[in-house]
């Protein structure tokens, strides 16, 4: 199972640095990993409607008779009612939404793992190495991996097939 430590170590290896043995280590690379990992991965997940991180949600009113966007939602793609901030305004009993949600590294597909490691390497590059040329190289690699990851993600949809109903049954 892939962990935060694994992803951060992959990023450090892309920089030519030694991998981490622990995120709690007392080193500059471990401190960067602790500080930047969550925000970097959340920004990467919310920056595109990744299918592997997209969920259909049904939200019920809370005890105050309000709808609140769940904490694991990074980006709302569609909502059946009016959304303002993290509140949903509706007279209905439940609200449906399609959202990009926070997921653990162990659930990342391989094409996203490489992209995430490269993005983390970009974030770690200047604080650790101070090398602008390495950063430019990582940016170029990231842009290429991002396009590839979006393509793979967009072509992995499962075709539900043709729905069953009388006209289709009569034709086929």
PLM features per residue range, with description:
Residues 1, 6-7, 78-172:
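Internal mixed-charge
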Residues 27-28, 56, 136:
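Sparse recognition of residues in long alpha-helices and their boundaries
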Residues 1-45:
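Long, hydrophobic N-terminal alpha-helical segment
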Residues 31-77:
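Short, well-structured hydrophobic secondary-structure segments
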């Amino acid at each position: 199972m892939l962990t935060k430590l694994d992803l951060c170590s992959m990023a450090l290896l892309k920089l030519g640095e030694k991998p981490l043995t622990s995120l709690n280590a007392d080193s500059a690379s471990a401190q960067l990993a602790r500080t930047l990992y969550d925000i970097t991965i959340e920004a990467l997940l919310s920056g595109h409607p990744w299918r592997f991180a997209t969920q259909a949600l049904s939200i019920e009113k809370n005890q105050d008779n309000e709808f609140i966007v769940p904490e694991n939602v990074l980006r709302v793609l569609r909502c059946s009612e009016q959304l303002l901030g993290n509140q949903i305004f509706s007279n209905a009993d439940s609200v449906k939404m399609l959202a990009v949600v926070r997921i653990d590294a162990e659930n990342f597909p391989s094409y996203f793992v490489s992209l995430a490691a490269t993005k983390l390497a970009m974030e770690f590059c200047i604080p650790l190495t101070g090398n602008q040329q390495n950063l430019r190289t990582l940016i170029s690699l990231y842009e290429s991996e991002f396009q590839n990851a979006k393509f793979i993600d967009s072509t992995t949809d499962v075709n539900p097939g043709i729905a069953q109903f009388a006209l289709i049954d009569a034709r086929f």
